[in-house]
C-alpha cells in the first residue's frame, strides 16, 4: 500500500556549540521549557499534521534520544498503521559508513523508505523550536506541481548571511540558491525543511552514488543540483515562531521567551498540542519560606528558596535561602542552600553546593549534565 508522506527527522547532530549540555546527549535530546526535549516539537508537528510514519535518523550519543522516543506512543504514533522508527548508521555488505551529510543519511536509509513506499518525503531537522502544519506545506507542494518545496522564513537582511538564501520569482519558484552569501539578494532563509517527490529524489541519490558524485548534503549539493537540472523547486513561506537553538545564548533566549503566558509558541493552544514523554512525578512542594514569581515550575519540584523569571524542570530542588533569577534548571538538578544562580542553564542531574554563586550576566553560564559545582572531591 502506498503511503502519501513519510517524515524523516535528522536528529544525529552533536551540537558542539551547546558545550557541556551535549557532551553526553545529542542536541535534539536537550531539555526545553521544563518538560520537553527539543525533538518533541518536530514529532508533535508530525502528529498534529496527520503524518503517521516517522523515521528518526540518529548518530551522535543516541541512547537518551532513543529512550525518550520509545515506540512513539507519547505522540500517538504507535498505531496499527503508524509508527516511529529509530534509524542508526550500520555497516552493510558494501561497507556503508557513518552519515557524511544530511542527504547521505537519507541515501543510507533507502531500504527503510522503500518499505514505507511514500509518494512524498518530508525532511526535518530535530533541533529547532517551532510549530508548523506540514499538511499545509504539502498542499502547496501539490498545487505548484513541485519536485521540491523548501520552507523559508523571512529574516532581517543583516542576519541573512547566516543562512541558505532562496531567490524566487513572482510565483515563489526558486530561481537561485546561495549558501550563506556575503551579499544576500533576498531575505528568504531556508529552514532546513523540505518536501521531495520520493522517486525523483531516490533516482538522483542512487545515480550520484553510482557515479561517485558528491550528493551528501541537501544545501550544498542537492538543492543546487535540482535547480541546475531544471526541476520545479518552490518556496513555502512560513510566518510563525521558529528558533534555531544551536547556541547556549539562543537556547537560553528561547526558554526565557517561553516563560511568558502569551509566548509566541502559543503553548496553551489545545488544538495544536506539544506532546512529550513525561514520567509520573509527585506534586510540587512550595514551602512557606519560598518566593516564586514569573516562573514555570513543573511536576515534582521542591522549592524552599526564591525563584524569579526562571524555569524549574521536573524534579528540580531549590533549597532554603537559594536565589534563582533568569535561569533554566533542568530535571533533577539540586540547588543548595543559600546558592545564588543568575542567567544560567543548569543541566540535568547537576548539583550546586551550598553557598555557590553563579553569575552569567556577561555570558550565559552553563553547568553540564550531572556536573557537580562546589562539591568536595571526597563527596563527588
Curated annotation (Swiss-Prot):
The keyword Repressor does not apply. This is Glucose-1-phosphate adenylyltransferase. One of its GO terms (molecular function) is ATP binding. CDD domains: ADP_Glucose_PP, LbH_G1P_AT_C. Homotetramer. Pfam families: Hexapep_GlmU (PF24894), NTP_transferase (PF00483). It comes from the Bacteria. Belongs to the bacterial/plant glucose-1-phosphate adenylyltransferase family. Its EC number is 2.7.7.27. Alpha-D-glucose 1-phosphate binds at residues 164, 179-180, 190. NCBIfam families: glgC (TIGR02091), PRK05293.1 (NF003670). Involved in the biosynthesis of ADP-glucose, a building block required for the elongation reactions to produce glycogen. Catalyzes the reaction between ATP and alpha-D-glucose 1-phosphate (G1P) to produce pyrophosphate and ADP-Glc. The gene is glgC. One of its GO terms (biological process) is glycogen biosynthetic process. It catalyses: alpha-D-glucose 1-phosphate + ATP + H(+) = ADP-alpha-D-glucose + diphosphate. It comes from Streptococcus sanguinis (strain SK36). It is an enzyme of class 2 (transferase). Keywords: ATP-binding, Carbohydrate metabolism, Glycogen biosynthesis, Glycogen metabolism, Nucleotide-binding, Nucleotidyltransferase, Transferase.
Amino acid at each position: 500500500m502506498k503511503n502519501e508522506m513519510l517524515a524523516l527527522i535528522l536528529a544525529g547532530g552533536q551540537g558542539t556549540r551547546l558545550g557541556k549540555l551535549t557532551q553526553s546527549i545529542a542536541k535534539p535530546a536537550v531539555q526545553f521549557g521544563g518538560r520537553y526535549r527539543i525533538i518533541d516539537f518536530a514529532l508533535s508537528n508530525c502528529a498534529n499534521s496527520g503524518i503517521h510514519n516517522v523515521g528518526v535518523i540518529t548518530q551522535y550519543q543516541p541512547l537518551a534520544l532513543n529512550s525518550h522516543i520509545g515506540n512513539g506512543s507519547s505522540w500517538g504514533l504507535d498505531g496499527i498503521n503508524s509508527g516511529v522508527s529509530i534509524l542508526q548508521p550500520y555497516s552493510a555488505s558494501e561497507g556503508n559508513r557513518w552519515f557524511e551529510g544530511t542527504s547521505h543519511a537519507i541515501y543510507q536509509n533507502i531500504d527503510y523508505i522503500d518499505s514505507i513506499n511514500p509518494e512524498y518525503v518530508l525532511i526535518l531537522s530535530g533541533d529547532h523550536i517551532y510549530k508548523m502544519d506540514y499538511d499545509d506545506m504539502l498542499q502547496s507542494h501539490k498545487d505548484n506541481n513541485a519536485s521540491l518545496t523548501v520552507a523559508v522564513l523571512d529574516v532581517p537582511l543583516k542576519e541573512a548571511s547566516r543562512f541558505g538564501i532562496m531567490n524566487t520569482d513572482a510565483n515563489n519558484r526558486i530561481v537561485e540558491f546561495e549558501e550563506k552569501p556575503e551579499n544576500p539578494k533576498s531575505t528568504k532563509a531556508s529552514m532546513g525543511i523540505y518536501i521531495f517527490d520520493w522517486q525523483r529524489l531516490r533516482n538522483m541519490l542512487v545515480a550520484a552514488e553510482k557515479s561517485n558524485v558528491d550528493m551528501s548534503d541537501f544545501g550544498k549539493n542537492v538543492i543546487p543540483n535540482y535547480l541546475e537540472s531544471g526541476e520545479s523547486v518552490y518556496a513555502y513561506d512560513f510566518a510563525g515562531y521558529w528558533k534555531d537553538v544551536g547556541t547556549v545564548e539562543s537556547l537560553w533566549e528561547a526558554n526565557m521567551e517561553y516563560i511568558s503566558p502569551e509566548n509566541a509558541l502559543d503553548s496553551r493552544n489545545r488544538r495544536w498540542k506539544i506532546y512529550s514523554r513525561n514520567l509520573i512525578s509527585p506534586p510540587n512542594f512550595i514551602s512557606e519560606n519560598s518566593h516564586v514569581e514569573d516562573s514555570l515550575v513543573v511536576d515534582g519540584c521542591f522549592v524552599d528558596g526564591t525563584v524569579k523569571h526562571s524555569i524549574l524542570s521536573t524534579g528540580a530542588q531549590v533549597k532554603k535561602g537559594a536565589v534563582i533569577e533568569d535561569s533554566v534548571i533542568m530535571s533533577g538538578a539540586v540547588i543548595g542552600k543559600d546558592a545564588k544562580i543568575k542567567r544560567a542553564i543548569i543541566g540535568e542531574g547537576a548539583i550546586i553546593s551550598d553557598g555557590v554563586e553563579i553569575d552569567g550576566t556577561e555570558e550565559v553560564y552553563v553547568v553540564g549534565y550531572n556536573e557537580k559545582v562546589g562539591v568536595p572531591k571526597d563527596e563527588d
